[in-house]
Amino acid sequence: KYIGADVDVPAGDIGTGGREIGYMYGQYKRLTGLYEGVLTGKGLTFGGSLARTQATGYGLVYMLDEMLKHNGKEIAGKTVLVSGSGNVAIYAVEKAQQYGAKVVAMSDSNGYIYDADGIKLDVVKEIKEVRRGRIKEYADAVPTAVYTEGKGIWTIPCDIALPCATQNELNLDDAKALLANGCFAVAEGANMPSTREARSEEHTS
């Protein structure tokens, strides 16, 4: 009654991955007898998309690349901050690094890591995708990294900021800090990560 191909198509998010979507899809089929496009993020055996895990993070960086080209800039050689450490953040980092960016920070709900030498994504993937650990474990594994508790990732000097964690994570003070520290581009990977005041500050600066 409340979900359907022409009603509402739920997707995974924080704490809800392919397994949980699979459970929901199985129950939907049991109740309706229908095999249709009603949930995104399903496994391939249930009709899911091959690159679903990477799609949002990769797409964010593709969009960023076009945005910068339009303004006579490029991703290569730029210093980047990425909030979050889930699928969107991990694959935004991966694609940004492929484009030649230096990603120096990532975060989770407890704090953030800063690695002046650039984030070692294989270490992050091991921690987050294999061990399901916390981002602070990165600092234990990488001597050049520093872990800081709390929300302070946007105070780090950068060229580009990619908020990929959660809604309203980037507020007015964060926007002012980014601009004061040389950030010239903000591209959003999460759903509405910037507050209205932050967006206004970014657009008028």
Q: What are the residue ranges of the model-derived segments?
A:
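N-terminal ligand-binding/catalytic initiation module
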Residues: 1-50
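Short, surface-exposed connector motifs at secondary-structure boundaries
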Residues: 5-6, 73-77, 156-159, 177-185
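Short catalytic-loop micro-motif centered on adjacent basic/acidic residues
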Residues: 10, 81-82, 160-163, 185-188
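N-terminal glycine-rich phosphate-binding loop for ADP-containing cofactors
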Residues: 16, 44-54, 182, 199-200, ...
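Flexible loop/turn segments at secondary-structure boundaries
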Residues: 17, 46, 88-90, 111-115, ...
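Conserved helix-loop functional segments at active or binding sites
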Residues: 30, 65-73, 152, 167, ...
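Glycine-rich phosphate/diphosphate-binding loop of Rossmann-like nucleotide-binding domains
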Residues: 40-43, 48-155
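Rossmann-fold NAD(P)-binding glycine/threonine-rich loop
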Residues: 165-205
